[in-house]
Amino acid sequence: MSAQPLLQVKNLSVFLNKNRQSFPVVESLSFNVFPGRTLAIIGESGSGKSITAQSLMQLLPEEHFSFSGEALFHNENLLDRSNVTTRSLFGSKIAMIFQNPLISFDPVFTIEQQFHEVIHAHLDLTNRIAHERILAVLRETGFQDPERCIKLYPHELSGGMLQRIAIAMALLTSPDLLIADEPTTALDVSVQYQILQLLKTLQKKTGMSLLMITHDMGVVAEMADDVFVLYAGRMAEYSSVQEIFHSPAHPYTVDLLASRPSQYRKQTFIPISGQPPHYTHLPKGCCYSPRCRKALPICFEQPPQSTPLNAHHHVRCWLHG
């Protein structure tokens, strides 16, 4: 990869402070998001995907969470809450859309009023130019009649339409990086596909980077250039989407791929047995060892370190250590 990373995360750890104890819910994550490319972070529910994304946006309350490591974006550390310059990046150079679009909107204000709130916070535009900008981004996201749309309240729109509006709102400031936290999970299957295609089209048009949070390997196959497999808040595997699908190295990655429905297997899918560990009761060795069909004795005793299989493929597994 010749280009410099737009976002460079180094040894990110997130600790939940509870009952006078500190639990590492995310530990020592390192990954890059490159200009114009999509990095997908995939894992089961409870793997730490959303915690990772929210920590980058400073959305986790300091009274309950503490952080270590760096997340460098335009030479600013996104984890530094005392830096005014860093805070100014959120909503302008970095935007985020969420799993449930309804929670992104205030029910007592029209869509237009909420667009103007974003503009007043981040852009210096006259009311006329702001209005034109709102209509333009709504047209870009597929609205045929944006004038009518902006007069409506959130409850008057479907989930798919609200997610399109959330994307349009994120695009108002022409961000360099869009973080999409499970953006299609709460939507119907046909609408999911439309939203994914919209994101791909907008990315190609604007050149923005995408950090996609998902539990769905189908979304990864459709959207990602690079893939970061996360389990129990720890990196399992990190590589290009081609290597993840064609040469998966970690048993968890293999099991995720096997758990997808397929018309080419006699058994349409193979579920992963057991449940991910709770952050308060993590296994002594590899966090995946209790569920792993290839576990070695050492897997239950010592956590593996990251091993490079090549320049762009890393795995944490004793099978490759």
PLM regions: where:
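Conserved ABC ATPase "signature" region
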Residues: 128-148, 257
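Short catalytic/signature loops enriched in Gly
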Residues: 5, 147-148, 238-321
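P-loop NTP-binding/switch modules centered on Walker-like glycine-rich loops
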Residues: 179, 183, 187-268
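Hydrophobic anchor residue at the start of the ABC signature
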Residues: 115, 167, 191, 195
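A short, proline-enriched helix->beta-strand linker immediately N-terminal to the Walker B motif
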Residues: 172-176
